[in-house]
Amino acid sequence: MSLSRRQFIQASGIALCAGAMPLTARADGGKNPLPVPPLLESRRGQPVFLTMQRAHWSFSGERKNPVWGFNGRYLGPTVRVFSNDDVKLIYSNRLNEPVSMTVSGLQVPGSLMGGAGRMIQPNMDWSPVLPVRQAAATCWYHANTPNRMAPHVYNGLAGLWLVEDSLSKSLPIPNHYGVDDFPLIIQDKRLDNFGAPLYNPPSSGGFMGDTLLVNGARNPYVEVSRGWVRLRLLNASNARRYVMRMSDGRPLHLIANDQGFLPAPMALNQMSLAPGERREVLVDMSQGNEATLTAGESASIMQRLRGLFEPSNILVSSAILTLRPTGLLPLVTNTLPMRLLADNIIDGAVSRTREFRLGDSLPGINGAMWDVNRVDVQTQVGRYERWIVHADQPQPFHVQGAAFLVRSVNGGLTPPEDSGWKDTVWVENDVELLVYFGQFSTPQFPFLYYSHTLEMADRGSIAQLVAQASNG
């Protein structure tokens, strides 16, 4: 759609009035302090409370607007639990509509995963006891309300869930939450002239906004000591995939993916992050000045002016977070460990191969829309399966109750950033996965596998999986 003559004149006037304002969005120089979500740690016998409610939040440090979230703020606190603990979690719904919740990446039985069988009505609670029996990982909790997942997550029903174990606590890597270990929940939104979020789902595909937010802030910065900084990245956007790099070219050292640590750190110049994916990276801030983690290209001046008059899905600014080193370099600095854990060893044979085709203009998986009364896949706990997933329209794909290794992408090698055990992957044409089922589910409480373009999931690109407990 082209600008009318009147709109062009108005836009030109705005540009002239901007004076010394930069014409293109800069990739450095954060403006707002990074909000760090409060940390809730599970203690033996002490429940974790997560109350869903309305709140008020400013996305730009100015006017506050109505949002959703947990415990009185936008988004939710970071929950930290420990392997081998049994965590009592109390979800309280103080909103005016039903919500279901899940913890993506947490390896628990289907009856504890949430979803359609665990709807939380207004002014009601759900109190599962979660047995944490997995290695350290960065997971996330979020709404997965049937047919309402996209607006519920967009409104603010999401937060990070960290699993720690003896290995994660002993590794020589940053682990001081909010000091050298930062959670980054990345979203894109469309804001009105008063800074209030707008949401108009498209008829096909997924929603994309023009404003990049991190922990609910635009263009944030954080001051860090000179040395290694750990960033726990979560893409909580409805549909947008990001390609990340540092503004000054320094490498991102990838140490963990969805389901935990890689065998060894990987130095990458750039990496992608699809909706639902989590990655942990280390950045060396011992040398040089401030540097900004960026996400692709920013809008040009004409694209930004056009956005004044019509909705845009081109990001005004690509800045995720600016790191500002302060102080002197310590006399003794930690070196990056050469190894993080042992190599992955597959202790079983592939039991069968399955193929899945994700819907594009028409939702569904293998041509079938989600039906809560239908089981689409039946398997057994302890099995490995080969899954070939195809998508003509690029989109992320997530599996509950399982973990997988990406074996190939479009018939070629797996991108380095997709190494290690995962539960979410970007599908652009074909990916081959080696899937391991470690938890059991039932027809009453099945696991889901689905498109993580949330609007696609809401339209029916979800299917159900039952993993029967092994007889051994």
Swiss-Prot record:
PROSITE patterns: TAT. InterPro entries: Cu-oxidase-like_N, Cu-oxidase_C, Cu-oxidase_fam, Cupredoxin, FtsP, TAT_signal. SUPFAM superfamilies: Cupredoxins. It comes from the Bacteria. It is found in: Periplasm. Gene3D superfamilies: Cupredoxins - blue copper proteins. Cell division protein that is required for growth during stress conditions. May be involved in protecting or stabilizing the divisomal assembly under conditions of stress. Belongs to the FtsP family. This is Cell division protein FtsP.
